[in-house]
């Protein structure tokens, strides 16, 4: 009997020791391997090579994914050309040299080539515009030039579009949003005349664009004010201006009209006057009823310092 009691006591001590052991009381930990290395090769999906763009679009639509349509196109304008074709090269100083000199002979030969090309272009223009002549067109071109600049000073963009091409319009109005332009035509020093006519084909055969270069020598007044009313450039005194203005028309268009297309600036032309920019200087804030001259600025005198050597 005593032996059995000892045996039960020993078994109970062993069971209690096994339950209270630190290895038994520790929480179970699950160790999982983590991939830290970047995979530079991703195996392709099964059957990805056999899929076409149409199959992928159909699959996306079936899944309810709507992909926006991307158009790789940009609008173009065919009412006018993108530049001046075969621009006229004015002689230096706009003076005729003697035909006996080497430079004068070269200038005369160049003029004959340009005249022959202009005569061929005039024939093409008259096929679509029977009223076109080199005698009456310069006066019409000068009227377009004067009216377009009047609309520019008033910034009437709707009427300005009818007199200038889509290529010339941004060049005329760029930077004039906060400026005031005062322009006037005084008089013509010389009668305007046609110096060159070109009528090339563009894009397709038979699609003709006519460009006529008109020489204008007149007196103008131009003065530009900034948004604060200060003069940026120009003056109210009339000045002699020599310009070569290009007018263009889409001959195939039955409703096309002659419009100003651009200007040719000779390489020997004098540089333009620099524009005086307005800057804001830090200073005392003025009231609406005060002027800058009414304020007395206190001049800070230098503080004397003692130098010890």
Curated annotation (Swiss-Prot):
According to the UniProt entry, its GO molecular function terms are: structural constituent of ribosome
Which Pfam families is this protein grouped with? Tim44 (PF04280)
Domain of life of the organism in this record? Eukaryota
Keywords from the named record: Mitochondrion, Ribonucleoprotein, Ribosomal protein, Transit peptide
Cell compartments where the protein resides: Mitochondrion
Q: Name one GO biological process term.
A: mitochondrial translation
**Which GO cellular component terms, listed alphabetically, does the Swiss-Prot or TrEMBL entry include?**
mitochondrial large ribosomal subunit; mitochondrion
Q: Where is this chain primarily localised? A: mitochondrion
Q: How does it assemble?
A: Component of the mitochondrial ribosome large subunit (39S) which comprises a 16S rRNA and about 50 distinct proteins.
What family is this protein classified in? Belongs to the mitochondrion-specific ribosomal protein mL45 family.
| Role this protein plays | Component of the mitochondrial large ribosomal subunit (mt-LSU). Within the mitochondrial ribosomes, required to direct the nascent polypeptide toward the tunnel exit and position the exit at a distance from the membrane surface.
Q: Which PANTHER family has this protein been placed in?
A: 39S RIBOSOMAL PROTEIN L45, MITOCHONDRIAL (PTHR28554), LARGE RIBOSOMAL SUBUNIT PROTEIN ML45 (PTHR28554:SF1)
User: What is the designated name of this protein?
Assistant: Large ribosomal subunit protein mL45
Annotated source species? Xenopus laevis
Organism phylogeny: Eukaryota, Metazoa, Chordata, Craniata, Vertebrata
């Amino acid at each position: 009997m005593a032996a059995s009691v000892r045996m039960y006591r020993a078994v109970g001590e062993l069971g209690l020791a096994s339950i209270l052991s630190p290895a038994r009381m520790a929480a179970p930990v699950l160790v999982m391997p983590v991939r830290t290395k970047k995979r530079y090769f991703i195996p392709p999906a099964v059957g990805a090579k056999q899929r076409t763009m149409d199959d992928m679009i159909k699959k996306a639509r079936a899944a309810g994914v709507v992909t926006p349509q991307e158009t790789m196109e940009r609008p173009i304008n065919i009412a006018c050309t993108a530049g001046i074709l075969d621009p006229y090269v004015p002689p230096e100083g706009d003076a005729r040299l003697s035909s006996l000199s080497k430079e004068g002979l070269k200038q005369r030969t160049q003029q004959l080539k340009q005249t022959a090309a202009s005569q061929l272009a005039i024939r093409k223009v008259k096929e679509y515009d029977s009223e076109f002549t080199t005698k009456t067109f310069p006066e019409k071109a000068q009227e377009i030039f004067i009216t377009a600049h009047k609309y520019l000073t008033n910034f009437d963009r709707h009427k300005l579009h009818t007199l200038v091409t889509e290529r010339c319009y941004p060049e005329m109005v760029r930077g004039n949003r906060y400026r005031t332009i005062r322009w006037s035509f005084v008089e013509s020093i010389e009668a305007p005349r046609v110096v060159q006519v070109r009528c090339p084909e563009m894009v397709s055969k038979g699609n003709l664009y006519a460009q006529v270069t008109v020489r204008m020598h007149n007196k103008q007044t131009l003065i530009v004010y900034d948004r604060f009313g200060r003069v940026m450039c120009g003056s109210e005194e009339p000045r002699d201006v020599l310009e070569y203005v290009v007018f263009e028309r889409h001959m195939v268009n039955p409703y096309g009209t002659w419009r100003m297309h651009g200007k040719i600036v000779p390489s020997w032309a004098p540089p333009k006057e620099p524009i005086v920019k307005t800057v804001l200087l830090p200073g005392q804030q003025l009231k609406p009823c005060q002027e800058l001259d009414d304020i007395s600025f206190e001049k800070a005198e230098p503080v004397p310092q003692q130098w010890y050597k």
